[in-house]
């Protein structure tokens, strides 16, 4: 009887834990507390490992949905901005018509690529693996992104300083680079509601290209700078950026993934009430590369 009880009790506990999770699938943090050193204990360990994987996959799906909703806002807004431009003047201006259609097509392609990359990520695949050897004409990509923001935010001034740039291709996929620059400029716009001037500077260094995005906005406190690349940073009130803007803070986290994937570097300097500057260093291409 004693032996039977020692077997049935932990089995009953494990069954109860399973029942709770079955009745409340959102409660994925529950784990078996059985610590016996026998087959039942091994079963409990495997059950907990299984729940760890299920919880991890669930979190990845939630991150995917959050990433998609965040990252698609800007290209959708760009397309809408160009369509509004067409409605106002494009019918009688072939130049505006061609520019807007080209921009809308470009952003639609970029959305497709972003979604595919995010799907790769949620499938536990490297979303950058297929583009390790791709190269990018940074000057052309930056002009494309700035052109989109000029249409989207007509009340802002976007300045491009490229007198120290280089025509050498950089070791990064063009769509991922444009996504990174879009995140930086979008961030600058959001936090510059008064002084609406954004400076983008390109400088060619010895082995890499430096792209700087400077705003004259609200700035970030020194205590908070070390956290800005964390996913959901802005949702944590203890580390909330000094702004009235709301959101979940996905953009800079995705930017950092791009930085790491292509062995880039990024530095941040900021002063409250003065502004923020992001310095993005992208290595020049070396060896066999492809330009999409």
Report each predicted region and the residues it spans.
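Short helix N-cap motif at coil->helix boundaries in the Bergerat
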Residues: 138, 219-230
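Short alpha-helical segment of the dimerization/phosphotransfer core of two-component systems
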Residues: 106-111
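Conserved micro-motifs of the catalytic ATP-binding
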Residues: 126-131, 167-172
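Short helix-loop "hinge" at the ATP-lid/N-box region of the Bergerat-fold HATPase_c
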Residues: 188-189
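Membrane-proximal coiled-coil signaling linkers
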Residues: 52-105
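Membrane-proximal HAMP signal-relay module
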Residues: 1-65, 83-88, 223-224, 231, ...
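A conserved beta-strand-to-alpha-helix junction within the catalytic ATP-binding
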Residues: 37, 132-150
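Short conserved segments within the C-terminal catalytic ATPase subdomain
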Residues: 26, 152-161
């Amino acid at each position: 009887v004693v032996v039977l009880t020692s077997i049935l009790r932990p089995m009953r506990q494990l069954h109860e834990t399973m029942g709770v999770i079955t009745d409340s699938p959102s409660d994925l943090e529950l784990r078996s507390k059985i610590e016996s050193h026998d087959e039942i204990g091994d079963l409990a360990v495997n059950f907990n490992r299984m729940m760890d994987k299920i919880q991890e996959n669930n979190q990845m799906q939630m991150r995917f949905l959050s990433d998609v909703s965040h990252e698609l806002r800007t290209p959708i807004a760009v397309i809408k901005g160009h369509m509004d431009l067409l409605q106002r003047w494009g019918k009688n201006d072939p130049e505006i018509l061609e520019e807007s259609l080209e921009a809308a097509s470009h952003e639609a392609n970029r959305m497709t690529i972003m979604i595919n990359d995010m799907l790769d990520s949620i499938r536990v695949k490297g979303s950058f693996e297929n583009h390790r050897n791709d190269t990018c004409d940074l000057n052309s990509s930056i002009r494309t992104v700035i052109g989109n923001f000029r249409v989207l935010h007509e009340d802002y001034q976007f300045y491009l300083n490229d007198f120290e740039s280089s025509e050498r291709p950089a070791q990064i996929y063009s769509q991922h680079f444009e996504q990174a620059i879009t995140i930086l400029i979008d961030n600058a716009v959001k936090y510059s509601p008064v002084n609406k001037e954004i400076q983008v500077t390109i400088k060619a260094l010895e082995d890499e290209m430096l792209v700087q995005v400077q705003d004259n906005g609200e700035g970030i406190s020194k205590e908070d700078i070390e956290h800005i690349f964390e996913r959901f940073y802005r949702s944590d009130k203890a580390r909330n950026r000094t702004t009235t803007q709301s959101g979940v803070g996905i953009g800079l986290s995705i930017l950092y993934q791009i930085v790491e994937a292509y062995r880039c570097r990024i530095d941040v300097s900021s002063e409250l009430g003065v502004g923020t500057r992001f310095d993005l260093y992208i290595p020049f291409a070396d060896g066999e590369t492809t330009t999409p």
